[in-house]
Amino acid sequence: MKIIFNSIMICLSIHFFSCNNKEQDVWKVYFFGGQSNMDGFGYNSELPDSLKGIIENAMIFDGNRDNEGNPNGGVGIWAPIEPGHGYEFKTDGKTNNLSERFGPELSFANTLAKKGTKVAIIKYSFGGTALFQGAGYGNWDPDQEGMNHYDNALATIKNAYDDNDINNDGRPDILIPSGIVWMQGEADAGHSQESADAYLGNLKNLMNLIRAAMRKDDLPVIIGKINDSHMYPDGAPTQPYIGTVHLAQDSFTKNDPCAAYVKDTESYKFSSDAWHYDTDGFIKMGQAFAKAAMGLELNCQ
C-alpha cells in the first residue's frame, strides 16, 4: 500500500510542476468513488439525446472494479466520457467494455463542459462496499491487511496519472486536482449500529487520504446523501441505521470548509430493486454534483 501511495506522489509531482505553455491542455480532475449508486444504474436507452453521445472536452479513467484480493483492480485507460460507465462496466487496461448503464459522471461532465471546463474524471467504485471492516461485500478500510478497495482506488489514481497525454493529442496535459465526489454509505447504514457509529471517523480518514493521494490537502469534497427506499415488505427500511450515517455525513460537511452535502437525492425515485435510483435520478445526481463543485470552487480557496 505504501509503495503505491509513494508512486502516486512522484507521478503527481511530475504533472503538477510541468512547464505550463500555451499548447498544453488544462484539465480539472475529479475523483469519483463509492458503492453501487456511484457505479450507476441509469439505463443508456432512456437517456435524452443530449447525453447519448460522447461528451466533448470530457475524459474518464474508469478503474476496473475488482473485489478484494484480486490483482486487476484499478487498471484502465483514459477515454472520452460517454454512456456505459455504469454497472457492469469492465476494462482490462487496454480496452473498455462499456455497459448498458451510466452513473453520475455523465451529466456531471456535461454540465461542467458546457461551462467551458475541460473535465477529467478518475472513477473507482464497487457495489455493496463499506468503510467498516466486516460490513458489506468488501470495504475501504486503509488499515485492513491485504488489498481492498482503498488500494484499488489508489491504483486507479496512480494509473490515471501515469499517462501524461490523456486525450492522446501528442501534447502533455496539465491536470489540476479539483474535487472528490463520494456516493456511499448504504452498506454501513445497513450493517449495524456499530458500523454506523464509526462512519464519521472512517469518512474523515478516507477523504483525507484520498486528498493526499490527489496531492491537495484542502481538495473540495462533495458527499451525496444516501436514502432509504422503504421498499421492503411492510415498508421496512433497507438501512436500519441510516439516521446515524446521515448525521455523520452532515457533520463532516458542516465542519469541513471545503466540503458540500448534496441532499437533492432525497427527491429521486428508486428503481424496482429498492436500492438504486432510476435513470432520471442519476441524471439529476450528476447535475447536482456539478453545481456543488462549481460552488466549492468559488468558496473554497
Give the ranges of each region predicted by the language model:
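Bacterial Sec-dependent N-terminal signal peptides
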Residues: 1-24
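Cell-envelope and extracellular/periplasmic
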Residues: 23-301
